[in-house]
Amino acid sequence: MIHEIFPVGMLGCNCSVIGDESTQEALVIDPGDEIERVLKLLQQHQLKLKQIIVTHAHIDHVGGAMKLKWATGAPILLNKEDYGLLKMLDIQAAWIGAPPPGADEIDQSIEDQDTIQCGTITGTVMHTPGHTEGSTCIYFPSEQKLIAGDTLFAGSIGRTDLPGGSFNKIITSLNDRVLALPDETVVVPGHGPLTTIGEERQSNPFLVKR
């Protein structure tokens, strides 16, 4: 599996380009900005973009999705519980002093337990509300990788003080869903360095059992 991870935009959102070497199909997860870099990587690996997946509708994760759709024709997938946040993109842009990206057009809602297929690569959607109502993670069992969006970080968790956030919900999502994964699972958070489920289970102050 090809997996390129790189920070984009003023808030350093971790964007993932995932490709199947046998079929040359690709996914892009959280294209928040710098779409030229995404397109360059797709071209470099000779990949055809099949789907654009957004873990949640905060501008730093979804801000470049429409531009990527225009460039490639690939559909945008996002959980429907975050559609309301999409209508606030101009407001979100003002929060961080960024230019408004314009409206995003979502092609399909991704739901809990949906299968994401990219050639021979299979991912499973996990609905993990808390950071936002529609926050999702994508788990790739054969690769033991979790694209966590802003649900889990190395040593921390997603903030819950923005519209749609709930501390109780994110803790439930983490305890019931995310920590059910094997300790060896590599976590690709929405920002910052990679970690593992085992490391977070042992040392994350929000998750350590007292």
Identify the residue ranges that each predicted region occupies.
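Short, glycine/acidic-enriched loop or turn micro-motifs at the edges of active sites
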Residues: 22-23, 33, 59, 82, ...
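Conserved beta-strand segments of alpha/beta enzyme cores
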Residues: 2-4, 48, 75, 108, ...
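Active-site HxH/HxHxD metal-binding segment of metal-dependent hydrolases
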Residues: 33-117, 202-206
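Metallo-beta-lactamase
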Residues: 91-95, 118-210
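Short acidic-hydrophobic surface loop/beta-edge motif
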Residues: 6, 18, 112-118
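Residue-level detector of beta-strand structural context in well-folded domains
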Residues: 16, 108, 113-114, 136, ...
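Conserved beta-strand hairpin/beta-sheet module of binuclear metal-dependent hydrolase folds
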Residues: 1-45, 137-149
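Active-site neighborhood of phospho(di)ester-bond hydrolases with catalytic His/Asp-centered motifs
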Residues: 28-29, 50-57, 76-79, 127-130, ...
